[in-house]
Amino acid sequence: MARSNQTARKATGGKAPHFAMRVWQHSTPPLKKPYRYKPGTVALREIRKYQKTTDLVIRKLPFQRLVKEIAQSLKADLRFQTGAVSALQEAAEAFMVGMFEDTNLCAMHAKRSTIMPKDIQLAKRLRGDRV
């Protein structure tokens, strides 16, 4: 390729002066991205939190509405004492915790860390419940 001579030219346009950019950058504060934890970190934190507490996980009023709705389908005009609903809730949560423990064991046996519907079905079959 042939060489060509460079000639001096008068600057017309081009980049803006550097100090003007600095003024523009500092006029608006930068938006901070929200921090994201690695996948699984928040789940492990929640597991540890709920294992420490003995509180009920399901809220009382939604559970009470569910009990009344199921009872309404069986027989009309049934009323429940507060203690009866809380005893039902305690038993339901104890059953669910045990069920999820067995389900987790089934998933671990299959060399998985994620539970699947087939794990619940296997846990119910091993417990003797109907599928």
Swiss-Prot record:
Q: Which SUPFAM superfamilies match?
A: Histone-fold
Annotated positions of the N6,N6-dimethyllysine modification: 10, 32
> What GO annotations for molecular function exist for this entry?
DNA binding; protein heterodimerization activity; structural constituent of chromatin
- Description of how the protein assembles with itself and partners: The nucleosome is a histone octamer containing two molecules each of H2A, H2B, H3 and H4 assembled in one H3-H4 heterotetramer and two H2A-H2B heterodimers. The octamer wraps approximately 147 bp of DNA.
Specify where it is mainly localized.
nucleus
Q: Which organism is it from?
A: Arabidopsis thaliana (Mouse-ear cress)
Q: Which InterPro entries match?
A: Histone-fold (IPR009072), Histone_H2A/H2B/H3 (IPR007125), Histone_H3/CENP-A (IPR000164)
Q: Please provide one cellular component term from the Gene Ontology annotations of this protein.
A: nucleus
Subcellular location as annotated: Nucleus; Chromosome
Question: Which keywords accompany this UniProt record?
Answer: Acetylation, Chromosome, DNA-binding, Methylation, Nucleosome core, Nucleus, Phosphoprotein
- Per the record, residues carrying N6-acetyllysine are 10, 15
Indicate where the modification N6,N6,N6-trimethyllysine is found in the sequence: 10, 32
The record's function comment reads: Core component of nucleosome. Nucleosomes wrap and compact DNA into chromatin, limiting DNA accessibility to the cellular machineries which require DNA as a template. Histones thereby play a central role in transcription regulation, DNA repair, DNA replication and chromosomal stability. DNA accessibility is regulated via a complex set of post-translational modifications of histones, also called histone code, and nucleosome remodeling.
Name positions with the PTM N6-methyllysine: 10, 32
**Tissue-by-tissue expression:** Expressed in roots, seedlings, leaves buds and open flowers.
CDD domains from the entry?
Answer: HFD_H3
- Write down what this protein is called: Histone H3-like 4
The chain residues annotated with the modification Phosphothreonine are 12
Q: Which residues carry this modification: Phosphoserine?
A: 27
Which family does the record assign?
Answer: Belongs to the histone H3 family.
